[in-house]
Amino acid sequence: MSMRFKFMSRRALLGGALAAAAIPLTARGQEGRDPANQEPTDVRIRIGFNKLTLTATLYDNPTARDLASLLPLDLKIEDYGRNEKIVHLPRKLTEEGSGPFGNEQPGDLCYFKPWGNLALFYADYRWDGLIRLGRFDNGFEPLLVRGEYPVRIERI
């Protein structure tokens, strides 16, 4: 009986190990894409307000693709705190496969899940509840201009 118990334990252990190894594979999105991907794509956007322009390259993740599907947008950009500007979107974006990320830095374009808004960072930040959508291409100096302005976001 103890031999059978050992055999069952090994079988259960092996099955558990195989299942644990398969979990990261099932967490991947359709077509083998990693939903939390931080790799840039060829999708670029332009953000224009107050006669200033920023460009950003979007990452290959479901949330960034959902944002791109909404473009062009004419909304409002405003200051929030001392490190970002925000843009309220017309609807929430998909959060499919999102997860935490590290190496936060100024120049990140993110989506804030609780409020459903874009967060454009020009200073250091660390906050849970964000999905990184991409990075600004050539700096973020226009974000330093304080105030609230009409903003146009479009694909380029």
Please name every model-derived segment:
Residues 2-19:
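N-terminal secretory signal peptides and thylakoid transit peptides that target proteins
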Residues 24-48:
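C-terminal segment of N-terminal export signals and the immediately downstream linker at the start
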Residues 51-57:
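Second-shell loop/turn segments in exported
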Residues 74, 81-99, 103:
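Compact, glycine-rich, soluble single-domain proteins
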Residues 117-123:
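Short, Lys/Arg- and Gly-enriched loop/turn segments at beta-strand edges
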Residues 135-156:
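Well-ordered alpha/beta subsegment
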